[in-house]
Amino acid sequence: MRNNIRIAIDGPAAAGKSTVAKIIAKRLSYLYIDTGAMYRALTYVALQQKVALDDEQALISLLKNTYIELKSSEQGQLVFVNGEDVTNIIRSEEVTNAVSLVAKHPSVREEMVARQRALAKNGGVVMDGRDIGTYVLPNAEVKIFLKASVEERAKRRHAENIARGFPSDLETLKKEIARRDQIDSEREVAPLKKAEDAIEIDTTSLSIEEVVDRIMEIVNERIG
């Protein structure tokens, strides 16, 4: 199998992007790049250092002094910030509720996108996020856009939170996910939207395995 194609998986919060992308990357022996984790890592540092999330200059200054590293392991992808393992803490409710506010700043996205493109320059990657197919990797050989209802996405996030031991309330999650959709869709730079050449998959009533199998069919068609 050719090892140099780039697979972009986009979609709104809790549509199943990361879960599916990890499995696809493992099957293809590709590098998995969780762009959302990079924004979460910066958000975590900003919250820790009490940087105002609406202060774009302060955030870009913080980012330029923050080393974010994604590492593969037996347990999956690990996220490090300046040498500290933040894999689990960046999934906290506090970070989750704040990450869209950080990601909407144009200069923050510009710096992150430069880092993401550098990681993907040699191909052999599966990258997920909100704007991979439209902005980060517009020439990706395979582009997928996952979607699901707000209710279904809230249920999934609720189950994830419970599994991680985080406090969780389903009705609150529905509101938060709808709010994040609005912020992500209306932001000035690279808003959440389906690339014209992306294949859309509604995951509301599909299992993870069914979504993975559908994407693998598409990948095999493109590289066959």
UniProtKB/Swiss-Prot annotation:
Q: What is this protein called?
A: Cytidylate kinase
Give an example GO molecular function.
ATP binding
Sorted keywords for this record are:
ATP-binding, Cytoplasm, Kinase, Nucleotide-binding, Transferase
**One protein family per Pfam:** Cytidylate_kin
Report the locations given in the UniProt record: Cytoplasm
Which reaction is recorded as catalysed by this protein? CMP + ATP = CDP + ADP; dCMP + ATP = dCDP + ADP
Report residues binding ATP. G11, P12, A13, A14, A15, G16, K17, S18, T19
Which SUPFAM superfamilies does UniProt cross-reference here?
A: P-loop containing nucleoside triphosphate hydrolases
Q: What class of enzyme is it?
A: transferase
Task: Tell me yes or no: is Oxidoreductase among this UniProt entry's keywords.
Answer: no
Question: Is Transferase included in the keywords of this UniProt record?
Answer: yes
